[in-house]
Amino acid sequence: MHTLIKGVLEEILEEEVIIEYPKDREHGHYATPIAFNLAKVFKKSPLVIAEELALKISTHEKTQGLFDSVVACKGYINFTLSLDFLERFTQKALELKERFGSQIKSERSQKIFLEFVSANPTGPLHIGHARGAVFGDSLAKIARFLGHEVLCEYYVNDMGSQIRLLGLSVWLAYREHVLKESVTYPEVFYKGEYIIEIAKKANNDLEPSLFKENEETIIEILSGYAKDLMLLEIKDNLDALGIHFDSYASEKEVFKHKDAVFERLEKANALYEKDSKIWLKSSLYQDESDRVLIKEDKSCTYLAGDIVYHDEKFKQNYTKYINIWGADHHGYIARVKASLEFLGHDSNKLEVLLAQMVRLLKDNEPYKMSKRAGNFILIKDVVDDVGKDALRFIFLSKRLDTHLEFDVNTLKKQDSSNPIYYIHYANSRIHTMLEKSPFSKEEVLQTPLTNLNAEEKYLLFSALSLPKAVESSFEEYGLQKMCEYAKTLASEFHRFYNAGKILDTPKAKELLKICLMVSLSLTNAFKLLGIEIKTKISAKD
């Protein structure tokens, strides 16, 4: 609808037109500030230009039946859509059903490679991982809904010092808790009950003879064993959030291409040796300094592995590559982009979204850390506490790059302070009305909208505005817009519902048709957020 109006106005005015929502609903459904943009060109006051353009638009043949009014106001041009247009758009939307909102031209479709979570398989997923996980999953849902092709990948760091440290930690726990030996732990090791669990499970699963090998062999065996167990648990944690990946890429497998990649970097004059280390000339591409790829002991840095991985990704020729990283990886972006340029790739195809920190409270106190994982809050614990849908909604309710703090008890309340409950409640009210109604759904769907007041028209307009919310959420990577849209629409519906009886009016079928439209938009919005909307709310909800 937004796109259609914009297209009509641009055709009439032969200028690019920005369409906005007026701050005051009494000013109409849409507004444009185009008169301000043209003031310098025509050397006239925006007020005069707005008046002239409003007259031109309102009398043009292409707008007949489209607007009830086109009014100039303080330099803006405000538009109120006609009921006839809203009715036609409503009928089309209700016919589209679950596809309503997915309106994109095929020539704009993209191939998107989306990598997110990619947490080291050295421990359970904690709440910090969940924010990026939920965001990435919903971004993929929205992108696919808009007709884009998306591959979701989890990059598994299954080699290197962290994996060896995992094996060492399990081996020491095995000696202490299975063999009952006195053990001296190093300054840095993986703590938590999960390490002890793995050690005890290894005692049951692995051949006793394996524990008679030399210590380095034992650590290597336990590293692989523990890594596999943690990856299974990570997948279970993601499943609890409703998240499934198309692909899991192994760093160990990807790193087999290291020599070929380094050879290309050398040919590109991207490397040099200094202090017995191999450096990348990343400072040539806006990095703060050059970066070490190979250390003095000939082992590779994490960056070396990431360079090989990104080269493998870019060989697949996607339109766009999106990484979702923790905010602490901000400085990492320039060095990865530098490597892509050296390897002959277009680094502008890579977009990195940074997820800020999450702080959970319960009864206004910091959420209790998990004994099992040490100093972390586990995803599973919070999902068990409040449910996946509530957790997904709250994680998506603020921009990814802003800090998020919330009290989980808010998500258990059954009032308007709990946004997800309030939205579920709106949909529940609609379905309860439909059940009580003497009219069939088919009767309601076939009823023409001919007698709506301004408030009813505005509620219908809000329900029909889902496509713009979907498009903006994707284009701006602002998934909070979907949450805001659903909250606002639910709030407008509750105001409409509380204003008076719906079923006991002569135009009950028309009002129920609006309700069906509201329900469809809320359902589709929630589906894109990875949430199943409720049609009934019981006392236990």
From Swiss-Prot:
UniProt-listed Gene3D superfamilies: Arginyl tRNA synthetase N-terminal domain, HUPs, Isoleucyl-tRNA Synthetase, Domain 1
Database matches in Pfam families: Arg_tRNA_synt_N, DALR_1, tRNA-synt_1d
Enzyme class, first EC level, given as a word: ligase
GO biological process: arginyl-tRNA aminoacylation
Motif ('HIGH' region): 119-129
Enzyme Commission code: 6.1.1.19
Entries under SMART domains matching the protein: Arg_tRNA_synt_N, DALR_1
Leader peptide range in chain numbering: none
Tagged with keyword Nucleotide-binding: yes
InterPro entries membership: aa-tRNA-synth_I_CS (IPR001412), Arg-tRNA-ligase (IPR001278), Arg-tRNA-synth_N (IPR005148), Arg-tRNA-synth_N_sf (IPR036695), ArgRS_core (IPR035684), DALR_anticod-bd (IPR008909), Rossmann-like_a/b/a_fold (IPR014729), tRNAsynth_Ia_anticodon-bd (IPR009080)
Keyword Transit peptide: no
HAMAP family: Arg_tRNA_synth (MF_00123)
Similarity field: Belongs to the class-I aminoacyl-tRNA synthetase family.
Protein name: Arginine--tRNA ligase
Gene: argS
